[in-house]
Amino acid sequence: MTGNNSTYYVTAQPTAYPPIGNAGIASVLCVRDPSETTQPNAFDITEADNLIPQHVSYTNVPLPHVPAMTQGQFNMQAYNAAVVINSWAPPLLVHCSTGDRASAAFAVFMIQFCGWPNADAADFAQTKLALANALFIQQVNNYTQP
């Protein structure tokens, strides 16, 4: 997606890191919880170590799905993720394990910084991105700035 003279990528966990740097992506936001240990797609503790030498900035703002966050917890964490999306150098890639939580974070960015109504941002994230989790859809629809 492009907007505000920036390019954004919303995706599942990258399987290789050199293509990210080679594509000119400047920043990566991971919204995975470092405690995710489920194989074959566990949290990659080497991600920052692989991206930084490629001159790609990296940060992690977890949106955990187990245990489920309260609406207030979601609002705070999604807001923090949206701040990163809004302020870090583009092009920016945001990811989680499957793209679902990354899509929720991007929807909150659209609400918070692009002026989208909650329902429109949630619909975009469901139809154009990978938002599918019913709880995250509800939390995007009910999002308010913390």
Feature annotation, model-predicted:
Residues M1-L93, A104-P146:
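Cys-dependent protein tyrosine phosphatase-like superfamily
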Residues C96:
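Short cysteine clusters
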Residues G99:
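Substrate/cofactor-recognition hotspot
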